[in-house]
């Protein structure tokens, strides 16, 4: 569609791809926040458990890095590697600069995970606004709300389970599984994935 000059069709295609990406990336990121303490307790030595919150910031940053891949599509399609390199360089410089300042100032390497997120977020913003005149993908506010709400309810469900159950490997798997079920159910009830779910169900029934 891009090669044919149909930018609107390309924008719709990328917008749907972004929606599908967020359907997976948001719960994955929120899930890391929900079970990072369980994961650290069950899998790591005691000395490393305290740093479990680092996992969330790394996952949060990676989520925005994934979004950036969709934002830079116009530059990729036109082989404008200079624009990509320039923005990624700025994002990296922000990360390094903040590390040099804040780690020395605060004396905590925990801040490195936060600055990594900030660097990825800056890169995303630069890419998003840098390509908006060429190709602007959009995500419906209703879809974003449903995804965030479903992820929030998933987090709450896992949080409640953690109150009553010990942190170990078996329960880690249980928390993740229950979180996936809750997220999927809320998404379906909200109507966000009802069409996709019904399509899959119909294919299974026909077989």
Per-segment meaning from a language model:
Residues 16, 50-54, 108-112, 139, ...:
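Residue-level signature of transmembrane alpha-helical entry/exit and packing/kink sites
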Residues 71-79, 128-142:
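Alpha-helical transmembrane segments
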Residues 156-207:
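Membrane-proximal transmembrane or re-entrant/amphipathic helices at the cytosolic face
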Residues 21, 55-58, 62, 88-92, ...:
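Residue-level recognition of transmembrane alpha-helices
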Residues 35-40, 44-48, 79, 102-107, ...:
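Short helix-capping/hinge motifs at transmembrane helix termini and TM-loop junctions
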Residues 1-88:
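Specific pore-lining/lateral-gate transmembrane helices of multi-pass inner-membrane transport
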């Amino acid at each position: 569609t891009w090669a044919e000059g149909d930018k609107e069709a390309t924008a719709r295609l990328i917008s749907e791809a972004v929606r599908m990406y967020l359907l997976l990336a948001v719960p994955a990121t929120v899930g890391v926040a929900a079970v990072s303490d369980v994961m650290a307790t069950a899998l790591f030595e005691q000395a490393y458990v305290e740093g479990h919150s680092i996992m969330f910031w790394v996952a949060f940053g990676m989520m925005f890095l994934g979004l950036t891949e969709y934002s830079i599509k116009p530059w990729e399609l036109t082989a404008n590697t200079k624009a990509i390199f320039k923005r990624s360089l700025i994002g990296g410089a922000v990360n390094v600069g903040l590390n040099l300042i804040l780690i020395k100032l605060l004396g905590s390497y925990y801040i490195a995970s936060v600055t990594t997120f900030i660097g990825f977020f800056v890169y995303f913003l630069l890419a998003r606004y840098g390509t908006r005149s060429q190709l602007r993908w959009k995500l419906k506010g209703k879809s974003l709300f449903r995804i965030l709400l479903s992820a929030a309810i998933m987090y709450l469900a896992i949080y409640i389970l953690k109150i009553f159950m010990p942190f170990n490997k078996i329960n880690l798997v249980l928390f993740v599984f229950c979180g996936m079920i809750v997220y999927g159910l809320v998404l379906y009830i909200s109507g966000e994935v009802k069409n996709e779910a019904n399509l899959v169900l119909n294919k299974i029934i026909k077989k």
